[in-house]
Amino acid sequence: MIKKRKKKSYTSVYALGQYISMSAHKARRVIDQIRGRSYEEALMILELMPYRGCYPIFKLVYSAAANASHNKGFKETNLVISKAEVNQGNTVKKLKPRARGRSYPIKRSTCHITIVLEDISFYQQYEEYLMYLKKPGCRNENRNLTCYDTYSSGGLWDKK
């Protein structure tokens, strides 16, 4: 079996919430509203939506932004939610006691939520660099960047 290695992404940061006691369907309704939005806009949307599932997702988005600013030094104004997914977790099965010694099963569903934030300032800098390279005459100016004095140190290898 061939394993593919993931390339390290220098512009993305994630936060993962596991075993959140909420149905995956209800969490997806909230996640679909914030996917692709900026960080600050997503926080405003999550604060104003009237669903119970907004609070754990709000905490995850906030945690992902804290990871971005602390671990990688990104600014929160440049962050965008690039990927937000909800997966089904384990189902906790309980028994509820009923009359005459009977019991009814209760299924408590959980979900796993992943929030990935990307820094868009990196892409803007990259696009500016590409525009710079497309300008006429800029490639010829940058060709003479090698310093030949570093290669000719006067050692054994310079003798003919």
From Swiss-Prot:
InterPro entries, per the entry? Ribosomal_uL22, Ribosomal_uL22_bac/chlpt-type, Ribosomal_uL22_bac/org-type, Ribosomal_uL22_CS, Ribosomal_uL22_sf
**Keyword Ribosomal protein assigned:** yes
A GO molecular function assigned to this protein is: structural constituent of ribosome
Listed under GO biological process in this entry are: translation
- Give a yes or no for keyword Repressor in this entry: no
Q: Where in the cell is it found?
A: Plastid, Chloroplast
Q: Where does it mainly reside?
A: plastid
The alphabetized UniProt keywords are: Chloroplast, Plastid, Ribonucleoprotein, Ribosomal protein, RNA-binding, rRNA-binding
According to the UniProt entry, the coiled-coil residues are: none
Name one cellular component (GO) term.
large ribosomal subunit
Q: Which NCBIfam families match?
A: rplV_bact
Q: How does it assemble?
A: Part of the 50S ribosomal subunit.
The protein's job, in short, is:
This protein binds specifically to 23S rRNA. The globular domain of the protein is located near the polypeptide exit tunnel on the outside of the subunit, while an extended beta-hairpin is found that lines the wall of the exit tunnel in the center of the 70S ribosome.
Which family does the entry's similarity section mention?
Answer: Belongs to the universal ribosomal protein uL22 family.
Q: What protein is this chain from? A: Large ribosomal subunit protein uL22c
Q: Native species of this protein?
A: Olimarabidopsis pumila (Dwarf rocket)
